[in-house]
Design a protein with these regions (language model features):
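Hydrophobic alpha-helical segments
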Residues: 36, 79, 83-87, 126, ...
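Short glycine/serine/threonine-rich phosphate/pyrophosphate-binding segments
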Residues: 106-110, 213-216
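Short glycine-rich, polar/acidic loop-and-turn segments at beta strand-coil junctions
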Residues: 62, 105, 126-127
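HTH-adjacent hinge/linker in prokaryotic transcriptional regulators
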Residues: 2-5, 15-23, 28, 34, ...
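Conserved phosphate- and dinucleotide-binding cores of soluble alpha/beta proteins
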Residues: 2-5, 9-12, 22, 51, ...
Length: 253
């Protein structure tokens, strides 16, 4: 088989399946593994596919999303998954913890399941603050500009205020997760607050259902591969987006 024919078939396989192992390509083309590896290196340099450990993934899989969904729509989506994620995350809170809770429907889903005593919370979400207060938890709400679309409080003053806190544990939401760009959100001001909050937490968990994998929004708030992720599932179809994130950093209820 000619080189151009191999290239065409490899691209076709990768785009059809999302990701393909080197050995599978070798068997399909009836070509040596060494030849396939050279082909993958060249196709990667041409930006036709993405070479990953043990194979290749499609560069077409990542979905750029330019518009943030309204909060009322987010609340009604993936409810069971978010409740499962929320319950798992809530169990990580211990007595006397000082907790940061970011905006986000998965983070908000934690609240009914929190069972720790003598715990204090800081949040930049008015909705989370109200729900925590309704359960008689001690809550501090950050100052700043109110963003009605998400119920978040954001801005430079919010970030400055965060610098005065040292959290034992923090929980953040993400609109998108993709290995090249990390954790993303549509709003620069929200991204600034998320980044600053991460720097003030001893332990950080990102809560995101599997629909967030492969989506890219305008602003990255972290590219740290050591951030711990709590999600509802992580099959081969979603792993291709987060291969650089170590499997011992994923938690699936």
């Amino acid at each position: 088989m000619l080189k151009e024919e191999r290239f065409s078939r490899i691209i076709e396989l990768v785009n059809e399946r999302g990701s393909v192992k080197t050995v599978e390509i070798s068997e399909d083309l009836n070509t040596s593994l060494a030849t396939v590896r050279r082909d993958l290196n060249e196709l990667d340099s041409l930006n036709k596919i993405k070479k990953v450990f043990g194979g290749a993934s499609s560069i077409k899989n990542a979905q750029f999303v330019g518009i943030e969904e309204k909060l009322e729509n987010k609340i009604t989506k993936n409810i069971d998954q978010k409740n499962s994620i929320g319950a798992y995350a809530a169990a990580l809170i211990s007595d006397y913890d000082f907790v940061y809770m970011d905006t986000g429907t998965s983070v908000e889903a934690m609240i009914p399941y929190i069972d720790a005593n003598n715990t204090s919370f800081v949040t930049n979400s008015i909705y989370i603050a109200n729900k925590l207060s309704a359960r008689d938890f001690k809550v501090f709400i950050l100052p700043g500009e109110f963003k009605s679309e998400t119920g978040a409080i954001v801005g430079a003053s919010t970030c400055d205020y965060l610098d005065g806190f040292n959290f034992s544990i923090g929980f953040l939401g993400a609109n998108g997760i993709q290995e090249e760009v990390g954790f993303t959100t549509p709003d620069m001001n929200e991204a600034m607050v998320k980044s600053r909050a991460i720097s003030r937490c001893k332990k950080v968990y990102v809560l995101a259902d599997s629909s967030k994998f492969g989506k890219i929004f305008q602003v990255s708030f972290s590219k740290d591969p050591d951030l711990e992720i709590i999600t509802d599932s992580l099959g081969d179809d979603t792993k291709i987006y987060v291969r650089k994130y170590k499997e011992d950093k994923w938690y699936i209820p």
